[in-house]
């Protein structure tokens, strides 16, 4: 089943300076793979760099177990449901998607890419985004060490990575809008029609 992002995200440019220098995770927090991802990040990554790179967890229905874990650490904000999460996502240092479980394409990653943000994701989250290239459209990190190194480098010299957000937006505009899918389907139907004509001759 194809996934398309809302076209207005490509022009989204609202920012909030309160979130500068932080990283954000977004997703419904009653979905177990999202809980698994946040728990992994908090324990393995935030515990090491949270004093310099705070974490914002955006999403409805965070379970009590997660809130108890988060309460053990400084520099973590749990927002719950947010009417306009893109203002936060656009403002942060990077969006993280350290998915450890689950499968399928992550809309949150597509949307983060569509607004021109830098996304640091696990290989599991990146794999379904066909055509996306590590170091060009997003940054893949699978271990805690890779996350720590990547986010630290981003914090120290984000301008060096700014091109990734721009390339991500162009990539999503070309491949993950409903208009792009329509073009692919029309082309497929046309090719099938021509093939049928050739076989009939």
Residue ranges and their predicted role:
Residues 5-91:
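Conserved catalytic-core segment of nucleotide-activated headgroup transferases in glycan assembly
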Residues 86, 107-115, 128-130:
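Short alpha-helical segment that forms part of, or immediately flanks, the ligand-binding pocket
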Residues 90-104, 115-118:
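Acidic donor-binding loop of glycosyltransferase active sites
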Residues 95, 108-111, 118-125:
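Short hydrophobic beta-strand element within catalytic cores of glycosyltransferases
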Residues 123-140:
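Short acidic/histidine- and often glycine-rich active-site loop of Leloir-type glycosyltransferases
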Residues 138-145, 153-158:
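Conserved acidic donor-binding segment of nucleotide-sugar-dependent glycosyltransferases
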Residues 160-174, 181-184:
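A short, well-ordered alpha-helix in the C-terminal region of glycosyltransferases
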Residues 178-201:
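C-terminal alpha-helical cap of glycosyltransferases
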